[in-house]
Amino acid sequence: MNKVNPKNTSPVAPKKVFIKTYGCQMNVYDSQRMTDSLSSQGYVTTQTPNDADLILVNTCHIREKAAEKLYSDLGRLRVMRQERTPDKPLTVGVTGCVAQAEGSEILRRAPIVDLVIGPQMYHRLPELLEKAKQGKKIIETDYAVEDKFAHLPPHNKRAVRKRGVSAFLTVQEGCDKFCTFCVVPYTRGAEISRSVEQITEEARQLIEAGVKEITLLGQNVNGWHGQSADGKTWRLGDLLYHLAKLDGLKRLRYTTSHPRDMDDSLIAAHRDLDMLMPYLHLPVQSGSDRILKAMNRQHKSSYYLHLIEKIRAARPDIAFSGDFIVGFPGETDEDFEETIKLIQQVQYSSAYSFKYSPRPGTVGATMKNHVDESVKDARLQHLQVLLLEQQNTFLRSKIGQKTDVLIEKPGRHSGQMVGRSPWLLPVVVDTESSTGSVVEIHIKNASSNSFVGEMTNR
């Protein structure tokens, strides 16, 4: 029998995956879950595509030119693959909402791509990857019959620890609202709510891995209506009360919400749960009832403003962020002024604003009376100046206050740490407190998007 000389053996190098993620927090979560799936196949993540064996581009289709960004990336990857030696092959995959929307068109325009996978098929990634390695071109953009979340592996605790003490947890996916500007119902499908049991188990996995703050995710997260173990249907408020009882969890958040699904039980949770952070992203898109109707938002501006009042009455320290679209088809100067009035009434801590761009397949793409681009530009600039003023006002209003901060990571300088304020903004503070601890700080100053604090004597 021939003996193996240990000196001539070397460990097999782990396979490396690089994932480029575009878009929303759910895409970030999806990329993390794909990483978890691949870790069971021997893959480790790398921060550079140059030494990757597998590159996945996780795409977003919400805004214009999303597909163009993808094809630009794929052009660079084509050159990278050409420069590879035979002993260092490269597999390329496209995932996310552009994958769902474009499908086979991606393979036609970019033959470098080996697999195209829609958001509902991530639980099959290891299996589909093996087929792609055998030379097959893979397209999987069907909506899964089975529950994809039930087939995803448990979180990789080591990977979770590397990501930090805050984590995303998807509880709901898809949307049934069919706003006329939005592609989400077509790329993510109908609303799916995970069960209470699934969510609780994943939350416990994250907590065991050191997570202290969980943000519940959904395209329409407050539309979540999951089944409990006894067969009852819970709403998001019920779920928040339930998760708040988990040992080791210090903070809860959720995003993104639709005004129509902000029910009284959810508002009560903001009143009753100190660990539910006083920050809410509640998009309205426009302040004009005429435009809201054209967008199929299913509410009027007065409903939204009344909702803001109810939430503030329940949680006076809450901060609101929002989304706004300018230049929707048919938007007049008067419609735009209604949006400005609404913003002035609400007083946002931050907001996202965009020029309308028609998305293929949506009702909005078939509408007439398009607004001139120069008018869109002027309106967007006007709106953003106002929103920036409100953001700065909010930041200045917190100077001199005391607040609790979740310490997340070391800062740039020795003895400095970066934490997360209740209002989501980062806080820089000189402290020896460990990552994951919650400390009280005194806000001394504010920049354009962060606070500077000092420890109190508490």
Curated annotation (Swiss-Prot):
The record's top EC class is transferase
Q: Name the chemical reaction catalysed here.
A: N(6)-dimethylallyladenosine(37) in tRNA + (sulfur carrier)-SH + AH2 + 2 S-adenosyl-L-methionine = 2-methylsulfanyl-N(6)-dimethylallyladenosine(37) in tRNA + (sulfur carrier)-H + 5'-deoxyadenosine + L-methionine + A + S-adenosyl-L-homocysteine + 2 H(+)
Cofactor(s) needed, names only, are: [4Fe-4S] cluster
Radical SAM core domain mapped to chain residues:
161-395
Residue span, MTTase N-terminal domain: 15-134
Q: How is the cofactor bound?
A: Binds 2 [4Fe-4S] clusters. One cluster is coordinated with 3 cysteines and an exchangeable S-adenosyl-L-methionine.
InterPro entries noted in UniProt: Elp3/MiaA/NifB-like_rSAM, Methylthiotransferase, Methylthiotransferase_CS, Methylthiotransferase_N, Methylthiotransferase_N_sf, MiaB_methiolase, rSAM, rSAM_horseshoe
List, alphabetically, the Gene3D superfamilies matched: Methylthiotransferase, N-terminal domain (3.40.50.12160), tm_1862 like domain (3.80.30.20)
A GO term, aspect molecular function = 4 iron, 4 sulfur cluster binding
Any Pfam family the entry gives: Radical_SAM
Where does the TRAM domain lie? 396-457
Give its localization: Cytoplasm
Question: What UniProt keywords are attached to this protein's entry?
Answer: 4Fe-4S, Cytoplasm, Iron, Iron-sulfur, Metal-binding, S-adenosyl-L-methionine, Transferase, tRNA processing
Spell out where the chain crosses the membrane. none
Q: Where does [4Fe-4S] cluster 1 bind?
A: C24, C60, C97
**Which annotated residues bind [4Fe-4S] cluster 2?**
C175, C179, C182
What's the stated role of this polypeptide? Catalyzes the methylthiolation of N6-(dimethylallyl)adenosine (i(6)A), leading to the formation of 2-methylthio-N6-(dimethylallyl)adenosine (ms(2)i(6)A) at position 37 in tRNAs that read codons beginning with uridine.
Checking HAMAP family in the record gives: tRNA_metthiotr_MiaB (MF_01864)
Question: Partners and quaternary state?
Answer: Monomer.
Protein's recorded name:
tRNA-2-methylthio-N(6)-dimethylallyladenosine synthase
Q: Which gene encodes it?
A: miaB
